[in-house]
């Protein structure tokens, strides 16, 4: 995905070069008491990625998208969730109307207190960051940038369904559509940031003003790439710093601190922005690569975004850290 990094990245780079005072947070000495929790299975999550990719690129409105969406709904239902869909018309960067499909799977649907876990499930229609310009109009396989976030959520839903004890609150797993339909690099003109995250914009418009909003949210975006580490994204810290601090600290305590370094990352246009604007504090687990063709990794918006380039260890680090956070909440 994503879109354009905010000017904060440029400012951070200037400050680092001029003063060698890059802002880095430190883990506090006091520890969080960790409660028992299930094991997140990275192999199962990887299989979920392979399955999504087996349908082909899930470009909004395509047959592969339809089939994969039906499969996602079926998997969440198999794991005991109540599945709901939101369909609505959105407009692409060039004004073309598009029928989007957001999928919500509710764990413990009867519980009033809820937590949001979310990811986008669509594929970018154009591999416009591929080194070969001949591929710039070809859809992206989207193993990492799309399937990985959904896979982590499906695995969490599975282990919650099979767990010996239930959580005392509900979880809304939301799969946002049309996140990656933003203006292609080869377009001569088009909109800006608002051309991205069309599904979450649609969803957030519905959520704004409601009293039954989730207490907080976590967005999974590109959570399976080789070499990925997850810095503290700027808008996440701005809207939900206590949640960022808690998750990063838990990750460090359970052995995944090298995947979740206590350092500031840049800002990014992503689904969590619209969730936050709807009044739900939401953070973004998104990679930050200091070196290479893209800060989002070398497969971003290329035809190399395939299951072969997924690192199960990264899936494990992200999934287990979030599961531990969820189980540290009060349980039945």
Label every PLM stretch briefly:
Residues 50-110:
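A non-catalytic alpha/beta surface segment that caps or lines the substrate-entry region
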Residues 44-51, 67, 71-78, 148-155, ...:
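Extracytoplasmic/secreted proteins, especially bacterial periplasmic and envelope-associated proteins
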Residues 97, 216, 223-332:
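Active-site-adjacent substrate-binding region
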Residues 137-242, 267:
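Acidic/histidine-rich catalytic neighborhood of metal-dependent amide-processing enzymes
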């Amino acid at each position: 995905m994503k879109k354009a990094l905010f000017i904060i990245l440029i400012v951070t780079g200037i400050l680092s070069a001029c003063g060698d005072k890059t802002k880095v947070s430190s883990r506090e000495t006091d520890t969080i008491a960790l409660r028992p929790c299930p094991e997140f299975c990275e192999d199962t999550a990887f299989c979920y990625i392979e399955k999504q990719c087996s349908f082909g690129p899930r470009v909004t409105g395509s047959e592969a998208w339809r089939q994969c969406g039906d499969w996602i709904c079926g998997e969440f239902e198999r794991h005991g969730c109540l599945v709901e869909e939101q369909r609505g018309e959105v407009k692409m960067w060039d004004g073309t109307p598009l029928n989007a499909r957001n999928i919500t799977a509710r764990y413990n649907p009867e519980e009033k207190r809820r937590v949001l876990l979310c990811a986008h499930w669509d594929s970018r229609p154009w591999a416009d960051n591929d080194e070969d310009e001949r591929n710039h109009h070809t859809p992206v396989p989207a193993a990492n940038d799309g399937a990985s976030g959904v896979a982590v959520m499906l695995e969490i839903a599975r282990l919650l369904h099979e767990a010996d004890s239930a959580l005392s609150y509900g979880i809304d797993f939301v799969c946002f559509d049309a996140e990656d339909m933003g203006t292609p690099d080869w377009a001569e003109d088009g909109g800006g940031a608002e051309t991205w995250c069309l599904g979450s914009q649609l969803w957030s418009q519905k959520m704004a003003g409601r009293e039954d909003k989730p207490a907080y949210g976590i967005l999974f975006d590109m959570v399976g790439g080789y070499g990925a580490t997850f810095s503290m994204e700027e808008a996440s810290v701005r809207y939900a710093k206590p949640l960022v601090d808690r998750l990063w600290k838990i990750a460090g305590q359970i052995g995944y601190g090298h995947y979740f370094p206590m350092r500031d990352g840049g800002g990014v246009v992503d689904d969590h922005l619209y969730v936050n604007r709807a009044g739900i504090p939401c953070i973004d687990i998104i990679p930050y690569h200091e070196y290479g063709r893209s800060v989002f990794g070398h497969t971003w918006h290329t035809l190399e975004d395939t299951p072969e380039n997924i690192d199960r260890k990264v899936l494990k680090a992200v999934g287990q850290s979030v599961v531990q956070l969820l189980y540290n909440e009060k349980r039945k």
